[in-house]
Amino acid sequence: MEPVGKAKFVEKDWGSETWMANNELEDYCGKILHIKEGQSSSMHYHLDKHETFYILDGQLMVDLINTSDGAQYDPIIMSKGETLEIKRGQPHQLIAHEGDVTFFEVSTFHKDEDSYRIWRNLI
């Protein structure tokens, strides 16, 4: 079997994403994200995208806003080998906790217009 393509590398202010797949027809996406020490994504949510994270290296702090309980703030610290599911509509921010962090993101198809920012990274 021959390789079907090359991964797409996307530079970000906070680090980088390596896109292994983003298939609209089959509704799946796979990425490796790298967040540099002291950096974070924006606080955002997706109406269509459903995500799962798997930590490869480092620690990831995921700040969640629990919208089902009066907008309660729920931070979670994840370490190597741990997973977390982010459901549609769940506000979340991804933060490198104590050094760089690298993790898999598997999800439904990624559309740029499905990222709704609540605030930019504040770190």
Predicted features and spans:
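Double-stranded beta-helix
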Residues: 68-70, 93-123
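Short beta-strand His + acidic residue motifs that chelate non-heme Fe in jelly-roll/DSBH
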Residues: 42-44, 62-64, 84-86, 91-97, ...
